[in-house]
């Protein structure tokens, strides 16, 4: 019944709560659901789209339940609030998860092809980015200028804003992750990576992984309490990119990557008490690999 549009007729507080309940369940499924779970069939019905004719308002398939009323952080009544923009970005994130799952099963069309899943997900991501209102964007929101008390007072806005920022950078980090294509090339003979794609994708992964570290620095500085394990997962994703660059021949990049890896791991440890999955990531072979790399570096210097 929750997925029937007729269930949400009316314009009262109870109806709004029903809408938020439905889309909250959808968002949870996009982030944490199994790829073959009960709610994990991501049809276009559930994909929110943007309308350019209405100042960037979110539109849905006529069969889908409407999004809840959301004006958090908006400067105009036609703009979607931060919660509603996050719903669409979560749908893109779920496509990224599916892409990685396909890669792990050797279901991978060369990512540089125009009809590849990589191209489709990247297109959805860029469309979403293009339609996010200016009021929610990093340069306009100026999170870095806000004091601790203001952030606590307006947590209803800043908590989803932070998650959207981490998600915004995690999506291209995963799509362009060096490990994804190194492993893919080893198991798929058709995946001969051209130098142009390899260079561009690895640079994009590093750029957005570095932005995740910047966001971590700001969260720590502003003493923002976070419990959602997605933040820890995003830190782990960024850490693996920095681990790759810990082997760089460029001394400055190598040093910066080691520093950023340590920041990601320290941040990830903060979620161990609330997430067993984050605890497993902290003690994963990749983290142990970094420790061995560090000991080898120290040995070579002595």
Where are these regions (language model features)?
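TPR repeat positional signature
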Residues: 26, 85, 167-169, 235, ...
């Amino acid at each position: 019944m929750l997925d029937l549009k007729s269930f949400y007729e009316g314009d009262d507080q109870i109806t709004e709560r029903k809408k938020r309940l439905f889309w909250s369940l959808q968002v949870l499924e996009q982030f944490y659901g199994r790829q073959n779970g009960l709610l994990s069939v991501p049809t276009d019905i559930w994909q929110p789209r943007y309308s350019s004719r209405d100042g960037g308002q979110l539109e849905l398939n006529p069969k889908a339940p409407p999004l809840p009323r959301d004006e958090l952080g908006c400067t105009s009544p036609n703009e979607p609030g931060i919660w509603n923009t996050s719903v669409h970005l979560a749908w893109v994130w779920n496509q990224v998860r599916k892409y990685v799952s396909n890669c792990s099963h050797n279901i991978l069309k060369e990512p540089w092809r125009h009809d590849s899943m990589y191209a489709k997900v990247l297109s959805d991501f860029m469309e979403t980015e293009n339609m996010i209102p200016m009021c929610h964007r990093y340069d306009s929101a100026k999170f870095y200028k806000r004091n601790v008390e203001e952030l606590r007072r307006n947590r209803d806005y800043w908590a989803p804003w932070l998650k959207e920022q981490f998600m915004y950078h995690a999506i291209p980090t995963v799509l362009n992750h060096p490990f994804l294509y190194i492993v893919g090339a080893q198991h798929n003979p058709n995946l001969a990576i051209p130098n142009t794609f390899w260079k561009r994708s690895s640079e994009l992964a590093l750029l957005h992984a570095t932005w995740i570290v910047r966001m971590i620095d700001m969260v720590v500085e502003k003493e923002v309490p976070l419990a959602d394990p997605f933040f820890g997962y995003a830190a782990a994703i960024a850490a693996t990119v920095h681990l790759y660059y810990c082997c760089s021949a460029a001394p400055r990049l190598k040093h910066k990557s080691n520093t950023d890896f340590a920041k990601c791991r320290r941040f990830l440890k903060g979620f161990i008490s609330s997430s067993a999955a984050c605890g497993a990531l902290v003690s994963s072979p990749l983290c142990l690999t970094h420790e061995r790399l560090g000991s080898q570096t120290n040995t070579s210097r002595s």
